[in-house]
Amino acid sequence: MEAATMAWTAAGVGMALVYWFVWVMGAAEVKGKRAVDLKMGSITNDKVKDKYTQYWSFFRRPKETATTEASAEKVPAFVDTFYNLVTDIYEWGWGQSFHFSPSLPGRSHREATRVHEERVADLLQAKPGHRLLDVGCGVGGPMRAIAAHSGSNVVGITINEYQVNRARAHNRKAGLDSRCEVVCGNFLSMPFSDASFDGAYSIEATCHAPRLQDVYGEVFRVLKPGGLYVSYEWVTTSLYRADNPEHVEAIHGIERGDALPGLRRQDEIASIAKEVGFEVLKELDLALPPALPWWTRLKMGRIAYWRNSLVVRVLTMLRIAPKGVCEVHEMLYETAQHLTRGGETGIFTPMHMVLLRKPVESK
Ligand SMILES: C=C(CC[C@@H](C)[C@H]1CC[C@H]2C3=CC[C@H]4[C@H](C)[C@@H](O)CC[C@]4(C)[C@H]3CC[C@]12C)C(C)C
Ligand SMILES: C[S@@+](CC[C@H](N)C(=O)[O-])C[C@H]1O[C@@H](n2cnc3c(N)ncnc32)[C@H](O)[C@@H]1O
């Protein structure tokens, strides 16, 4: 073979390899987000590293972030930064629903996710014509599943503008934009009128609130009397021991890597709900047996993580992805280890479910 032909062949093979590596290996968990499209929300490429450093220094000591009023007030802004940094990586590596669900034998992760979301609609007894509120809606995976399953209309609220745009685009694509609406705002002070929703839910979102009373109080205000509210809460369980260094490391790791101003205890949730005026109808940790572990999806993905971190490195080198993505990806990888540890030891659950009702006689 002539040298020129050999060079062209080598170049062709090289190009094919890059194509395979980036477009095929870097394909999305759920089609729609590819590694080559990774952005850092509304942060411009030159600011990603700085924003990540700011985020990290704020949440490095998670418990301290909620202790003074001044730092608690900054939490929503840093949560917004966090979601600018992670939203695309979450969509790429996990899908459009940013939460966990118990594994289901013989069913895919996608199906298990949907079942966990439809359970919310069933608990709320949601019907066509109902107006539901999704508190901390992400890019709207649960909202679309719940609207499709129940026939209800859903309004989602998220602090992160980039997520609002992603969610609206997904709603249009799914043909659900006439029944699913997304608003950018703070769930600690919501831009909705009193008694304007038939039902409300929050899936793994209220853990970002420095004081649960504030978000539950707002949900109480916007619900109609008799309206139901379901929440899946991130909490430490009764197995957590504050004098066990391994427990403390796992919980701090979860808080740091998930923008949490300090996890609450499982036994605090119902009393906070009562404090703001709710009746507690049901309370159950959905992670308890016979439910199968929610963390197996994180564990089974070791090879996928390795592949993803390679993809992210190559894309950063090629300047397709912004500088700082590798650091964010590494942080998420470590967080996954802490979450797995939290699940395996039973000291943490991301699905402590409460079903609450605003009393019929309340204003
Ligand atoms: C409710 C919250 C988010 C829960 C989960 C959706 C996310 C928690 C940790 C995330 C991930 C960890 C490892 C990532 C991996 C290194 C990467 O290659 C692909 C994406 C991950 C799997 C990512 C996906 C989302 C999580 C599982 C919190 C924030 C309250
Ligand atoms: C882990 S995501 C869960 C998203 C969605 N519930 C799901 O399961 O896909 C948490 C969500 O809460 C939102 N959030 C956190 N703090 C908020 C605040 N103060 N106001 C409004 N949204 C907030 C985030 O923007 C994000 O959309």
UniProtKB/Swiss-Prot annotation:
It catalyses: 24-methylidenelophenol + S-adenosyl-L-methionine = (Z)-24-ethylidenelophenol + S-adenosyl-L-homocysteine + H(+). It is a single-pass membrane protein. One of its GO terms (biological process) is methylation. The chain crosses the membrane at residues 6-26. The keyword NAD does not apply. Keywords: Lipid biosynthesis, Lipid metabolism, Membrane, Methyltransferase, S-adenosyl-L-methionine, Steroid biosynthesis, Steroid metabolism, Sterol biosynthesis, Sterol metabolism, Transferase, Transmembrane, Transmembrane helix. GO terms for cellular component: membrane. Catalyzes the methyl transfer from S-adenosyl-methionine to the methylene group of 24-methylene lophenol to form 24-ethylidene lophenol. Belongs to the class I-like SAM-binding methyltransferase superfamily. Erg6/SMT family. This is 24-methylenesterol C-methyltransferase 2. It comes from Oryza sativa subsp. japonica (Rice). The lineage of its organism: Eukaryota, Viridiplantae, Streptophyta, Embryophyta, Tracheophyta. The gene is Smt2-1.
